[in-house]
């Protein structure tokens, strides 16, 4: 299906706006993947806030020109799916997790913070916990000293109340 000029401009504008909002771009080759698997990948991506698009590579190159994702323009060859996400690790997680179970999806690379990523870079990015998990871990670290202090104070109070209960019993035995 051939696109006319206005349709191409609309696609470029849409992808340019996605690229402007996104922190991460992941590129994967989808040669031989079934429609059912692609539908599952798209629904997983949508639920995690990742925008997946199958684009003509020429349009994708034009859309990312001048953006932080321009560094991967040379990787845009062959049948590719492009994953954009505002969350720094979401696109990498979705594509890497799906690629583990489906060997037809091959990660080709990506970009993060204006730097090109190779396959290993995308996989390392996918292994980083999400922002919510990192914030929960930080809260746990900050709460740890407070909760330890509360436990120690509770133990001291319990020990002191046991000690005061033993003193009258000791006086009764002595009498």
UniProtKB/Swiss-Prot annotation:
Entry keyword annotation includes rRNA-binding: yes
Molecular-function annotations in GO: large ribosomal subunit rRNA binding; structural constituent of ribosome
Pfam families: Ribosomal_L10
Gene Ontology CC annotations of this record: large ribosomal subunit
Keyword Kinase belongs to the record: no
Keywords assigned by UniProt, alphabetized: Ribonucleoprotein, Ribosomal protein, RNA-binding, rRNA-binding
InterPro entries membership: Ribosomal_uL10, Ribosomal_uL10-like_sf, Ribosomal_uL10_bac, Ribosomal_uL10_bac_type, Ribosomal_uL10_CS_bac
Similarity section: Belongs to the universal ribosomal protein uL10 family.
Task of the protein: Forms part of the ribosomal stalk, playing a central role in the interaction of the ribosome with GTP-bound translation factors.
Oligomer and partners: Part of the ribosomal stalk of the 50S ribosomal subunit. The N-terminus interacts with L11 and the large rRNA to form the base of the stalk. The C-terminus forms an elongated spine to which L12 dimers bind in a sequential fashion forming a multimeric L10(L12)X complex.
Protein name: Large ribosomal subunit protein uL10
Organism per entry: Delftia acidovorans (strain DSM 14801 / SPH-1)
Gene, per the UniProt record: rplJ
